[in-house]
Structure formats: C-alpha cells, structure tokens
A protein has these predicted regions:
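Signature aromatic-anchored transmembrane alpha helix within multi-pass, membrane-resident enzymes
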Residues: 1, 16-17, 328-332, 383-413
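Interfacial juxtamembrane loops and adjacent helix segments
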Residues: 47-95, 99, 107-110
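Transmembrane-helix motifs of polytopic, lipid-linked glycan transferases
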Residues: 119-140, 178, 321-325
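Transmembrane-helix signature of polytopic, membrane-embedded enzymes
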Residues: 132-155
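Hydrophobic/aromatic-rich transmembrane helices and adjacent perimembrane loops
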Residues: 337, 359-388
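Catalytic lumenal/periplasmic loop and adjoining terminal transmembrane helix
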Residues: 392-517
Length: 523
C-alpha cells in the first residue's frame, strides 16, 4: 500500500454503511439494560449527594416509596456543581471530575433519565471516529488505514457497550486518541508552538478524564525519548513542559486523592482480589476478543459455556499477534514503537501487580483501553495494507468482512439483552425477574439491608407502588401488616434470621437461580 493512498469508492461506501450501523447501535435501546450499581453512583454524583448522607436518610427502618429512593439519583435545587466535586473527592477520589461535571450540565439541559444520561456517552463516543482517523493519518500517513480503523471502531462490541454506559470510558477513549494524534502532530511540526499547546490541552483533558491517563503519558514519553535517541533537544523539552503542565494542573485533584487515599483504597480494593492464573488468562482472552466478537459470557460463567468460544476467540487472538508482528516488521520504527509504547505501559502496569501480588486489575475490561486501541491500530493497518495489495485482496477482504459481521451480530444480540457482562451480572443478573415478581403484587414491601448502590439499581426496575424498608445490619425493622406481599431482597443472615426469630415470619425463596436473592415472608 502506498502512503497517502485513498480508499476506493466501493470501500468508502462500505465503511460509511458500517459507520451508520455503529452509530445506530450506540443510540438503540439505551434504557434497555439494567442501570447497574456503578451507574447509580454516576447519578448520585450528578445529583450532588454523598453515599454517607443518603444512607443516613434512607437506611433508618422507615417505609419509603420508590420515588423517594430515586430522588437521590436526580437533580434538585439543593445541590450544585460544588457538591458533585465534593462527593467525588470525599468518596471516590480515584475518579477525576471532568466527565461528572459534563454529565451534570447535560442532565440540567436534557433531563436525568437513564436514556438521557447514557446518551451523553454515546454522543462523546462519536468523537472517537475523527480522532482515530487523524491518528492514523499522523502515524501511518494512510487514509485507507484511517477508514478501516473507523469501521472497526464503529462496530466494535466493546466500544459500543461502553458508549451506552453512564461512566467515563468513552470520554477516556476519545482523550487517548486525541492526545496521541496531537503528540504526533506536535513532533512532526516541532517548531510550531501551537501544536505543543494543543497537546498540553489534550493531556489536561486526559488526566481529568481518568487517572490512568498518566500511564498513557508515560508511554508517550518513552516514545518521544526513544525517537529523539535520548537526547535533550527542543522536542523532548517541549514534551516535558507539556507533561509537567498537565501534572501541575492536576495538582488540586492530586491533593484530594492524597487526603482521601484510604477511601480510594477501600473503594478499589476489590480489584486486588486474588484469582487463579487460569481465570486471569480467561479474562484477558475474553476482553481482547470482545473488540470484534462478544457472546455475552463473562469470566464467572462456567467452563462448559466458555469452551465452545475457543474456536472464535483463538483466531481473533492469533490475528492480534500477527498484526503486531506485521507492524513491527513492515513499518518504520517511528510507527511500530508508538503502537508498542501506547499499549505496553498500561499492560505492564496492570499485569505485573496481578502476577506478583495477586489481583484482577488487568482483567477489568475498561482499564486496558490504551492496549485495545494499540491493537486496533495494528489490525487496521494490517487489513488496510492487504486489501489494497492485489495478490492478497480476496483473503483479507474476507477477514475484514468477517470482523465486521462478528461485530454486527454481537451488537444485535447485546442490544436486546437486559443484563450483559459489563453490567455487573454478579450484582444485577436476577434483578429483571425479581422486579417482575414484585411488580405483580398488589401492595408489595421490600425489606433489605443490601448496599445502597445494589438497592438503587433495583429501584430503576420497580413500579411506583412498591414500598421499601431499608436498614443497616444488624438492625431488624418492625414490619407493618398492611401489605399484600412482603419480600426480603438480598438479606444478610442477620436480617433473615432476626425476622424469622423475632417476628415469627417464615421465609421461602420467591425467585431462585444459582443464588437466592429474593425471599417471600409469610406467617
């Protein structure tokens, strides 16, 4: 493929069609999937509340309605932007505030329904298309690669899923692509101060989108120093100034992280939960394959369900390996080194602690996004090169069509689902069925001592007639007898046994899967 070669009319038409399909899936059925606990925290932050004050108001044993429960997920005149920032700083300092401030402004303009809040991520995700095209032009000087990259990104099941989630992942994806393209542009026009100013601005946006952007910055730094042969010249100095400016700009939030480090550690300690190497490998393979194909299965599913997918996952992983090797062999150092630097720093920062200390950080699908983008760049260039090479056009066109078809099928299936692997199925998998059972009752009451985010997630599926009685373990509520049906939702052993022993109720499963989340009370 010649540098600067333009795509054919047929290829351009195909990719435009794929792009339209990808955009459609980003906005289709936005409110279909469960609003999972992590997303309820997004709404909590947008509303300006802290978890502590909401628990204090709700978990007191008083009977409340669903509307009252959900009031703390909605905007109100009592809370402002400062409350959003304060809530993040105190309870989730590992999350930088840029996305949440944008989301609050979005909610003020368009409303705070599930579809509206999620649509912000969908709109932001559209910015990734021009950004990845620009990056391909700067990196490969190849419009064909840029068009192929747009097609693969637009219909990628992984990126479509996170474009429909009320979390910062889409914003971070755009920030990574934008800062990477801006860096290459600034290096190419090293004497242009404006170029480095733009890169500085993208670094600030990246850092305030997600703290792991620091790893992307390190990758950029390795690339700059290596390309400049570790000499301190104008390009290196300009990069250092841009990076230091970004870090200094982040200093106020760095203080918040330091001041509330214990809270950040407590909130994220789940990622340090030890898992076997086999589970870790399964998570890596599953996450990587979801760039092009997604069956909906997660790492917690049984091996019997996962085994048949090897016939799909293995070829995709082999394609990734071949693409990386192809780029290293066939492109200049300035190209392949950038791809390796972009992906490897984040990869090593996540994988090494897991292998040495134990944990599952590297298996969290949204953390290695820089790695995914590096792989997608390599695959895009591999396909773009071969579909314009006459000897191998037919084979690689088949590969290209297969990847696009896999993405379309995956997005079609996932768009109809209420629970998917990215919606915390270990916390939400039975909620749709549970909500149906409760909503069928004439005058139902739900009693629970489950965590706030768990209860609020279920609340989005409940009818307004449903009443709730929430307590903090080991408290046992006094149950009124003016309800047609009384349910226990995900009760602790203390709550269940306390109600049985102290108030003479019998508990029996109202819905039973592999775990029992809902009990019905009777006397």
């Amino acid at each position: 493929m010649q540098k600067g070669q333009r795509p054919s009319t047929q290829l351009r038409f195909l990719i435009i069609v794929i792009l339209v399909i990808g955009i459609f899936f980003r906005f289709f059925n936005l409110s279909r999937k469960v609003y999972w606990p992590d997303e309820t925290f997004t709404s909590l932050r947008i509303a300006g509340y802290t978890k502590t004050e909401v628990v204090e108001k709700l978990y007191n044993g008083q009977v409340i309605g669903v509307e009252y429960l959900q009031n703390y997920q909605r905007l109100n005149s009592e809370k402002g932007i400062w409350d959003t920032i304060k809530g993040l700083a105190l309870e989730e300092p590992q999350h930088t505030p840029f996305y949440y401030l944008i989301a609050r402004g979005w909610a003020q303009l368009f409303g705070d329904s599930v579809a509206t809040i999620r649509s912000l991520s969908a709109w932001i995700s559209l910015l990734a298309f021009p950004c990845i095209y620009w990056l391909c032009i700067e990196l490969f000087n190849s419009p064909v690669t840029g068009w192929v990259a747009i097609a693969l990104l637009s219909i990628s099941p992984f990126h479509v899923l996170y474009a429909q989630e009320a979390r910062p992942s889409s914003l971070w994806t755009v920030a990574i692509l934008l800062s990477s393209a801006a860096l290459l542009r600034a290096m190419r026009q090293s004497k242009n101060i404006a170029g480095w100013g733009i890169y500085t601005a993208t670094v600030i946006v990246s850092l305030y989108s997600f703290l792991f952007s620091g790893l992307v910055m390190i990758g950029h730094g390795i690339y700059v120093f290596a390309i400049e042969r570790f000499r301190i010249n104008k390009t290196v100095i300009a990069y250092l100034i841009a990076s230091c400016t970004g870090i200094l700009t982040l200093a106020p939030w760095g203080y918040a992280v330091t001041a509330n480090l214990a809270q950040a550690t407590t909130t994220t300690n789940w990622s340090g939960t030890k898992v076997s190497l086999f589970i870790l490998l399964t998570m890596w393979a599953g996450n990587l394959s979801r760039l092009f194909f997604d069956s909906g299965l997660g790492s917690n599913d049984s091996l019997i369900k996962l085994l048949p997918l090897i016939t799909v996952i293995l070829p995709i992983l082999l394609l990734f390996g071949y693409a990386i090797g192809f780029v290293i062999r066939q492109t200049p150092k300035s190209v392949w080194l950038f791809i390796l630097a972009l992906g490897s720093v984040t990869f090593l920062a996540l994988v090494l602690p897991d292998l040495i200390l134990g944990g599952r950080r590297s298996g969290v699908a949204r953390y290695p996004i820089p790695c995914y983008l590096a792989i997608q760049l390599a695959v895009s260039h591999l396909i773009a090169t071969h579909i314009t090479h006459h000897r191998r056009q037919k084979l690689w066109r088949i590969v290209f069509i297969a990847l696009l078809t896999g993405g379309i099928l995956s997005c079609t299936i996932s768009s109809q689902a209420q629970v998917w692997w990215n919606k915390g199925p270990e916390r939400t998998k039975y909620n749709p069925q549970i909500a149906q059972i409760v909503n069928r009752a004439a005058k139902p009451l739900i009693i629970s001592d489950a965590k706030l985010d768990i209860v609020q997630s279920l609340g989005y599926l409940l009818d307004p007639k449903v009443q709730l009685q929430l307590v903090i373990e080991p408290n046992i509520p006094k149950i009124a007898d003016n309800f047609s049906d009384i349910f226990l939702y995900r009760p602790s052993r203390t709550l269940r046994s306390g109600i049985e022993q102290a108030q003479g109720y019998k508990t029996e499963p109202a819905y039973q899967g592999s775990e029992i989340w809902l009990y019905r009370l009777s006397k």
